[in-house]
């Protein structure tokens, strides 16, 4: 077995890219290290960076399609091989890169027979397509396909509300996440007193892993800057205030709860994004308000299978992670 060797700084905290690869235009990979870190620091940074990479970076997606030929999402159009639903799913997969703020319009206008691909989308100059070969539809007859598109830049994901089809326009569930997956690992040295943080990043091509690392770091810094101010700022918020009611709370109440149920609190403090779940499973759980290990254990395998877009393979993967990392299991049914 050949062990990998890397050169790290002995004093100054430094980062560098130790590996990069392009599997395709829509799948880029990068591996980075940060060192030297004191014991415990690598995990602190790694968890925060993974969450920022998956949830804090903006992406550009097609969010709505409009055509007079669409009667409903699962209809078919004479002369087009794919159903409307399949066309919408193909549009959802188009990877875009932009300097867009908010939303803009685009369109498709093609006459068959022939294949409709991403290169047939007419875009504003500040939006570009990463892979022009991405398939949209197959026209089998000499018909004209005209589709109006709405493009949006945002972060995270959006779920369309039911029954939102109107005037030949249909929303597309966008996933504004340029980072497909992110993992972190830790290598200890000097008798466990020093650590090297390894970050692995996979992107959809709209950002390179290095660009994603920069964006995530900048967003984290922006969130923490207010804490660097030595005094609380009394901003003039007249006309822009919102009162949030809070439940009664004392230190002793909190201490009593911690003492009473230490195991429950421990499970509640472990967030699901610390479990190296794939982004798709992670997002499905978040949509069902499952954020911690305690939330997850309050559900059975049967409950998970009732969630939208959840598959038996996803449940098996969760069971494997729970067994490997926490030596616990999910019941098949609620008792």
Curated annotation (Swiss-Prot):
- In short, the EC number is 2.7.7.6
General function of this protein: DNA-dependent RNA polymerase catalyzes the transcription of DNA into RNA using the four ribonucleoside triphosphates as substrates.
Q: Could you describe the subunit structure of this protein?
A: In plastids the minimal PEP RNA polymerase catalytic core is composed of four subunits: alpha, beta, beta', and beta''. When a (nuclear-encoded) sigma factor is associated with the core the holoenzyme is formed, which can initiate transcription.
Sorted alphabetically, which SMART domains does this protein's record hold?
RPOLD
Q: Does the keyword Transmembrane apply?
A: no
Which GO MF terms does the UniProt record name?
A: DNA binding; DNA-directed RNA polymerase activity; protein dimerization activity
Look up the record and give one Gene Ontology term from the biological process aspect. DNA-templated transcription
Per the record, the domain of life is Eukaryota
Q: What protein am I looking at?
A: DNA-directed RNA polymerase subunit alpha
- Identify the Pfam families for this entry: RNA_pol_A_bac, RNA_pol_A_CTD, RNA_pol_L
**Alpha N-terminal domain (alpha-NTD) as annotated region, ranges:** 1-231
Family per similarity comment: Belongs to the RNA polymerase alpha chain family.
Subcellular localization is given as:
Plastid, Chloroplast
Cited InterPro entries: DNA-dir_RNA_pol_insert, DNA-dir_RNA_pol_RpoA/D/Rpb3, DNA-dir_RpoA, RBP11-like, RNAP_asu_C, RNApol_insert_sf
Q: What is the lineage of its organism?
A: Eukaryota, Viridiplantae, Streptophyta, Embryophyta, Tracheophyta
Q: Name one GO cellular component term.
A: DNA-directed RNA polymerase complex
Q: Domain remarks in the entry?
A: The N-terminal domain is essential for RNAP assembly and basal transcription, whereas the C-terminal domain is involved in interaction with transcriptional regulators and with upstream promoter elements.
Q: Supply the source organism for this entry.
A: Lactuca sativa
HAMAP family the record matches: RNApol_bact_RpoA
Alphabetized, the UniProt keywords read: Chloroplast, DNA-directed RNA polymerase, Nucleotidyltransferase, Plastid, Transcription, Transferase
The keyword Coiled coil is assigned to this record: no
Annotated region Alpha C-terminal domain (alpha-CTD): the residues are 263-335
């Amino acid at each position: 077995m050949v062990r990998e060797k890397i050169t790290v700084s002995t004093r100054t905290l430094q980062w560098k890219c130790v590996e990069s690869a392009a599997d395709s235009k829509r799948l880029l990979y990068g591996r980075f290290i940060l060192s030297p870190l004191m014991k415990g620091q690598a995990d602190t940074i790694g968890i925060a960076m993974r969450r920022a990479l998956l949830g804090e970076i903006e992406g550009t997606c097609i969010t709505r399609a409009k055509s007079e030929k669409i009667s409903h999402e699962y209809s078919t159009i004479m002369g087009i091989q794919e159903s409307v639903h399949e066309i919408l799913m193909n549009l959802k997969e188009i990877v875009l890169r932009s300097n867009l703020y908010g939303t803009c319009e685009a369109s498709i206008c093609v006459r068959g027979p022939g294949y409709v691909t991403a290169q047939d989308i007419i875009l504003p100059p500040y939006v570009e397509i990463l892979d022009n070969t991405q398939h949209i539809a197959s026209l089998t007859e000499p018909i004209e396909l005209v589709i109006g598109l709405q493009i949006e830049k945002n972060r995270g994901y959006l779920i369309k509300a039911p029954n939102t089809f109107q005037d030949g326009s249909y929303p597309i569930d966008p996933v504004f996440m340029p980072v497909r997956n992110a993992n972190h690992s830790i290598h200890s040295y000097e008798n466990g007193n020093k650590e090297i943080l390894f970050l692995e990043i996979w992107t959809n091509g709209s950002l390179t892993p290095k660009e994603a690392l920069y964006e995530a770091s900048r967003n984290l810094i922006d969130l923490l800057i207010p804490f660097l101010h030595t005094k609380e700022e009394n901003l003039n918020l007249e006309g822009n205030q919102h009162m949030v009611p809070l439940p009664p709370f004392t230190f002793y109440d909190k201490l009593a709860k911690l003492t009473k149920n230490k195991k429950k609190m421990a499970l509640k403090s472990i967030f699901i994004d610390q479990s190296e779940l794939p982004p798709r499973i992670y997002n499905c759980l978040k949509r069902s308000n499952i954020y911690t290990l305690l939330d997850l254990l309050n559900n059975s395998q049967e409950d998970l299978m009732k969630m939208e877009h959840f598959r038996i393979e996803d449940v098996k993967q969760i069971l494997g992670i729970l067994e490997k990392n926490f030596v616990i299991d999910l019941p098949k049914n609620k008792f």
